[in-house]
Amino acid sequence: GKPNRPRPAPIQPRPPHPRL
């Protein structure tokens, strides 16, 4: 069997930065 390729970490949504 083919070795499983390590999938990249899932992209997490950035927390909304406070608008100054």
From Swiss-Prot:
Q: Does the keyword tRNA-binding apply?
A: no
Arranged from A to Z, the UniProt key words for this protein are: Antibiotic, Antimicrobial, Immunity, Innate immunity, Secreted
Identify the stretch(es) annotated as Disordered. Answer: 1-20
This protein's major location comes to: secreted
Q: Cellular component GO terms, alphabetically?
A: extracellular space
GO biological processes: defense response to Gram-negative bacterium; innate immune response
Which compartments is it annotated to reside in? Secreted
Induction summary: By bacterial infection.
Q: Which family does it belong to?
A: Belongs to the apidaecin family.
- Name the job this protein performs: Antimicrobial peptide active against many Gram-negative enterobacterial and plant-associated bacterial species. Not active against other bacterial species like H.pylori, P.mirabilis, B.pertussis or N.gonorrhoeae.
Name of this protein? Apidaecin 1+
